[in-house]
From Swiss-Prot:
Keywords: Acyltransferase, Flavonoid biosynthesis, Transferase. Gene3D superfamilies: 3.40.47.10. GO terms for biological process: flavonoid biosynthetic process; polyketide biosynthetic process. It comes from Perilla frutescens (Beefsteak mint). This is Chalcone synthase.
Length: 391
């Protein structure tokens, strides 16, 4: 007689969840950060606000961002002046864009990941889709299933309105799915388009202006599964553990509200301080069981909320400058793409590790950490193990 325990044992995978492929995509429209203040104040009819423009210029200069990609073009914004005002009803116009474009950009990234994975898409058993850009029913997960031609029986999870920490959340969810379902292959997609948050400047809300200096568009996809098929599937990173926590005394530090005017973001100045003050506790909880307490001995993938967060984390933990190299590279080349960022950094790290002849996908190191920070303040901590590179 078969018992429930027997069935349960057979349902579980044997090994840890692994990232098997990564794909990324951006809109074609590329924006140069050095000329963006002139463009932004022109397109929002705000050139008369010279003091505010000077402040914005300084924000852009300090951002450490070289360029960003944006779906919104100058032509489109000229035709939709409500989206260039600071607080004009414009949700319908914004929704019309993102409901269509978020799944499409996600498809581009997913196709690249599926191609690298090397298996037929019919073997995808689960889909986890995450976006902070727009809300619809049926969701972006449904639209992507149709766009990619996935099986109708694929098990879908849709995560809307989570914000910048969610790149860690999707990996945590994919890990649980892969390890608890033998043979599961989870397609994870984060797709973000700033059409919901773009707005003109305001003297009274400089935190909104910070977002306009940082946010960019992008989508990233990964395939996650346990027990890779030898010779067919090539693991890149193992997902060893995952945790989420709400930081103490951080209520209201980062808020986002969906209104008639679109998605409004509100930031407190002490966000970098709150994160850097509490980050070591998360590290100790994650790496204590492994006997690791030297934060320079692990590779780093941190959501680049902005340069101030990275600078303060680096200073607080005494990190060597090269630790956040991949993180800063992605911030510089793409800006803050919310949930998609950490997956872009994961991709950058494995590529640069191979290119530079390092012994593992984690810059030659075995253990690594992936951090997501976002509204709450919520922090996601994922412990990674690299895979040897056969150079």
């Amino acid at each position: 007689m078969v018992t429930v325990e027997d069935i349960r044992r057979a349902q579980r995978a044997e090994g840890p969840a692994t990232v098997m492929a990564i794909g990324t995509a951006t809109p074609e429209n590329c924006v140069d950060q050095s000329t963006y203040p002139d463009y932004y104040f022109r397109i929002t009819n705000s050139e008369h606000r010279t003091d505010l423009k000077e402040k914005f210029k300084r924000m852009c200069e300090k951002s450490m961002i070289r360029k960003r990609y944006m779906h919104l073009t100058e032509e489109f914004l000229k035709e939709n002046p409500n989206m260039t005002a600071y607080m004009a009803p414009s949700l319908d116009a914004r929704q019309d864009i993102v409901v269509v474009e978020v799944p499409k950009l996600g498809k581009e990234a997913a196709q690249k990941a599926i191609k690298e994975w090397g298996q037929p898409k019919s073997k995808i058993t689960h889909l986890v889709f995450c976006t902070t850009s727009g809300v619809d029913m049926p969701g972006a997960d449904y639209q992507l299933t149709k766009l990619l031609g996935l099986r109708p029986s694929v098990k879908r999870f849709m995560m809307y309105q989570q914000g910048c920490f969610a790149g860690g959340t999707v990996l945590r969810m994919a890990k649980d799915l892969a390890e608890n379902n033998a043979g599961a292959r989870v397609l994870v997609v984060c797709s973000e388009i700033t059409a919901v948050t773009f707005r003109g400047p305001s003297e009274s809300h400089l935190d909104s202006l910070v977002g306009q200096a940082l946010f960019g568009d992008g989508a990233a996809a990964v395939i996650v599964g346990s027990d890779p098929v030898v010779g067919v599937e090539r693991p890149l990173f193992q997902l060893v553990s995952a945790a989420q926590t709400i930081l103490p005394d951080s209520d209201g530090a980062i808020d986002g509200h969906l209104r008639e005017v679109g998605l409004t973001f509100h930031l407190l100045k002490d966000v970098p301080g709150l994160i850097s003050k509490n980050i070591e506790k998360s590290l100790k909880e994650a790496f204590g069981p492994l006997g690791i307490s030297d934060w320079n001995s692990v590779f780093w993938i941190a959501h680049p909320g902005g340069p101030a967060i990275l600078d303060q984390v680096e200073a607080k933990l005494g990190l060597k400058p090269e630790k956040l190299r991949s993180t800063r590279h992605v911030l510089g080349e793409y800006g803050n793409m919310s949930s998609a960022c950490v997956l872009f950094i994961l991709d950058e790290m494995r590529k640069s590790s191979a290119k530079e002849g390092m012994s593992s996908t984690g810059e030659g190191l075995d253990w690594g950490v992936l951090f997501g920070f976002g509204p709450g303040l919520t922090v996601e901590t994922v412990v990674l193990h690299s895979v040897p590179i056969n150079n």
